[in-house]
Amino acid sequence: MVTTDSGAVRGAWHEHTSADGRTSRHAVFRGIPFAAAPVGQLRFAAPQPPVAWDGVRDATQFGPTPQRISPYNPPRVPEPSIPGEETLNVSVTTPDPSASAGLPVLVYIHGGGFIGGSPASPWYVGEAFARDGVVTAVLSYRLGFEGFAWLADAGRDGVVNNRGVLDWLFGLEWVQRNIAAFGGDPSRVTIAGQSAGGAAVMRLLTMPSAQHLFQGVLALSPADASSPVEATAEATRRVAQASGCEPTAESASRVHEDVFFAHREAVDSPRDPSQPRIIFKDAPLALAPCVDGEVCEQTVSDALAAGVGADKRLFIGSTAHEFTMMLSPSRQQLAGLDPVPLLVEAGASEELARDVVEDARERGELERGTAWVLGQAISDVIFRSCVAHWAQTRKGGPAPPGRTTSGGSRARPTSRARRTASTSPSAWTCCPRRGSRRRSDRSRRRRSPTSCTPTGWASSATARWTPPSTATAGRPSSTDRMPVIGAWSRHTGCRSASGTRSTPRPPPHPAERPAPSGLTLIFASAHPELHPSHRVKRRSGA
């Protein structure tokens, strides 16, 4: 039993056996409200404290989810929808639920394009982190119209905009007040997320109002959560019109959330291949965190350039095939179509479109079909270019991109994030996805040079980062081990396994051609004195 500032909760003890046969025991506390149910007058308001309860509340089952039905058909990730009103809740997994434990904390924000996703996924329970002495907390937040619609009557009767962002802040405040009771140290918090969750943590990193809530950031395949007011207001107007109401809280409160969800899909769906304009022209996530000058004061890029969050540790990267699987159901619909006019229609120049297709042909990927080529273009423009740009913009020096290769296999982004989170011993590890050990070793010798970070890595094909302050006695602290840049010579000019060194290439512009398959990793440090030009001797066992 653990006592929070709203009341006592009772969790359950679970056992976990890892792939290497290690067994560990951890406690789980699920569905704990961190805010009042966002219904009635609170539906479009800022989050408010939950109603306190007497006695001991059962916390052995996941709580209600903001997602009522998955927007992905078929679902790509096991993220269940659970009915109920108390949708703003947190689930905690801890190896030691005692106030004296003082363990590091990982707070995870799920993805789903800000219209879907669930904190109740079995992929997010954090068993492996608990095994290695890390407390995990998974937050929910309002989605779609409920969380991100731009309402014209904001400022009256408690109505606010950027409600989903305010939910993140409120959840992190709950962590600061309560995580010590679960064995966590509120001064050692790392926030993490993948896809829209990665965008969320980058958004939080660049918000002055959030700086006291965490010390490190893990952003996996983040998109740019910096929608302009005009784009969000227009998307809100279209959804409201299709749903039979005005873009105000007063009018929208009479419409059920499922109606907004259905028309959000019909009006502007990023999974509809008949609307390729979303790739280059329009904001792909219009109902998303909005730069309003108040909650979100600046774009992520501008805030990074201004040095906001420069004292925080940052791990940022993206999968090479972030969006290809999203277009897989449309493979037959797009089969045989020339991708060049589709890319031009999407806003790319004809020269760029032909470059994209030619690059796919050179890599032998054109035979995979038009859906694959379009998916790669979306991955590059929406996700991978953000990673390179933000790492370069990060105050403290340039950060050329690096990659680990995966033999051309398709990367399923959340499954990779899940494996990273669930199997790494107190670290986030990115490595080749498929193939035998022997084949992987051959691949490493052939094309995986060593890292050129100031500290080096244990393996040329594996990148690790330990969350803040999780290093054990006798080992370097996480600050000492934090890399500035992870980069590999075939693409960036860093020193290779053979000891050769070529001229570094700058990070790709968003309009550049897609990069080879694999996993893109960028590591950016808060320490400006650590720069890739500092050549170091490779160290083993880091």
Segments predicted by a language model, with ranges:
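Non-catalytic accessory segments of hydrolases
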Residues: 1-162, 435-450, 460-466, 485, ...
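C-terminal, loop-rich substrate-recognition/catalytic regions characterized by aromatic stacking residues
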Residues: 47, 309-358, 486-511
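Mobile gating loops/cap/lid regions near enzyme active sites that modulate substrate access
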Residues: 69, 384-514
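Serine-hydrolase-like catalytic core of hydrolytic proteins
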Residues: 72-249, 304-327, 396-398, 463-464
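Substrate-access "cap/lid" subdomains that shape
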Residues: 177, 211, 220-342, 375-392
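Intrinsic-disorder-associated, low-complexity terminal segments enriched in Asp/Asn/His/Tyr and depleted
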Residues: 509, 527, 531-534
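Short, intrinsically disordered C-terminal tails of secreted or membrane-associated proteins
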Residues: 536-541
